[in-house]
């Protein structure tokens, strides 16, 4: 999957882990949409 910035990682990408992943059919349980993504399927696992 492709990385993306999680909403809970902070306001910028510098120094933050891009621990998101692309899920084609929506986010699995415990995963949520990535910050700043309009497209569905970009998910990140929240702490």
Swiss-Prot record:
The keyword Disulfide bond is assigned to this record: yes
Cellular-component GO terms for this entry: extracellular region; nematocyst
SUPFAM superfamilies linked to this entry: Defensin-like
UniProt GO BP: regulation of signal transduction
Compartments where found: Secreted; Nematocyst
An example Gene Ontology molecular-function term: sodium channel regulator activity
SS bond list: 4-43, 6-34, 27-44
Subcellular location, principal: secreted
Keyword terms: Disulfide bond, Ion channel impairing toxin, Nematocyst, Neurotoxin, Secreted, Toxin, Voltage-gated sodium channel impairing toxin
Alphabetical list of Pfam families matching this protein: Toxin_4
Family as reported in the entry's similarity comment: Belongs to the sea anemone sodium channel inhibitory toxin family. Type I subfamily.
Role summary: Binds specifically to voltage-gated sodium channels (Nav), thereby delaying their inactivation during signal transduction.
Annotated protein name in UniProt: Delta-actitoxin-Aer1a
